[in-house]
């Protein structure tokens, strides 16, 4: 039977945002971010029907994601964004920083939701944290696989806190391909599971449960079909993009040959000489001459 990694879009969402996955989500955030919340709930809960609607909407728009975005809200109103990015692309750090800033400003002015009676919209702002899972080297292969970035005082390295003694912003990155990580630490177990789909005997019970939940053989038939359809669509889309790139390269090479041929013709070379140098046939060269007249 075909196997799929837990980083597959549907499986990653199910693992962290299904109604019975709250304890897995909470442990995942604690192990990677280093903060233990009393409660943590996803903004959008995973259900196969809502996921199908989400996928069909993106499919109609021609969007084929290589990343998974999850937003979770804690009991204190803080927001944690979780992204699983399987492919490297330009400006990744800028993008995740933008998402973090958006998560921070999301509660601005929402005094009712924050329970804050102060007549000041800034008092409604809550901390924002970002967790980014990457299947590539972002900071270099010899850097630590798990990296956290905080707002710190330049001299004392003390974190910048809000009034309620909460850190303002934290960005966390876990590379699945970087080997510089403490063996058998909670983060190591997550890295091993997400990268291979397997768990060791010493893995925490919640990671073992995450494996059972995301095992393809344990999925409902509807979920299995959805995953296979999505992966097939991605493969077709990827092949089309690859073909378009090759076609563009070929077209570019032909245009370069034509430009070179015209230069040779203008300085008095014969059609036969230009054909031998550029590889263009005589008829094509004559056509180029006529177009220049």
Q: Positions of the model-derived regions?
A:
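Conserved single-residue anchors adjacent to enzymatic active/cofactor-binding motifs
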Residues: 1-223
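Short, charged alpha-helical interaction segments and adjacent helix-coil junctions
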Residues: 2-3, 80-85, 185-293
């Amino acid at each position: 039977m075909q196997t799929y990694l837990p980083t597959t879009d549907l499986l990653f969402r199910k693992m962290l945002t299904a109604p019975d996955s709250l304890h897995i989500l909470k442990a995942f955030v604690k192990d990677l971010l280093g903060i233990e919340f009393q409660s943590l709930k996803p903004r959008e809960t995973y259900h196969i029907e809502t996921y199908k609607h989400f996928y069909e909407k993106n499919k109609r728009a021609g969007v084929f994601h290589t990343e998974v975005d999850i937003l979770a809200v804690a009991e204190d109103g803080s927001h944690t964004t979780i992204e699983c990015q399987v492919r490297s692309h330009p400006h990744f750090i800028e993008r995740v920083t933008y998402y973090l800033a958006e998560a921070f400003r999301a509660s601005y002015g929402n005094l009712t939701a924050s329970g804050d009676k102060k007549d000041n919209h800034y008092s409604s702002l809550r901390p924002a944290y970002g967790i980014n899972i990457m299947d590539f080297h972002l900071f270099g292969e010899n850097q630590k696989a798990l990296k956290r970035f905080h707002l710190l005082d330049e001299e004392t390295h003390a974190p910048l806190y809000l009034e309620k003694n909460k850190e303002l912003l934290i960005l966390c990155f876990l590379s699945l391909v970087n080997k510089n990580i403490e063996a058998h630490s909670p983060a190591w177990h997550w890295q091993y599971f997400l990268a291979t789909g397997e768990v060791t005997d010493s893995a925490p019970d919640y990671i073992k449960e995450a494996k059972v939940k995301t095992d393809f053989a344990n999925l409902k038939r509807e979920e299995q079909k959805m995953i296979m359809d999505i992966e097939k669509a991605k493969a077709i889309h990827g092949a089309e993009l690859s073909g378009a790139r090759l076609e563009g390269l070929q077209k570019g090479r032909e245009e370069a040959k034509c430009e070179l041929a015209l230069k040779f013709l203008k300085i008095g070379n014969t059609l036969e000489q230009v054909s031998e140098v550029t590889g263009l046939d005589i008829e094509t060269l004559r056509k180029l001459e006529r177009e220049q007249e």
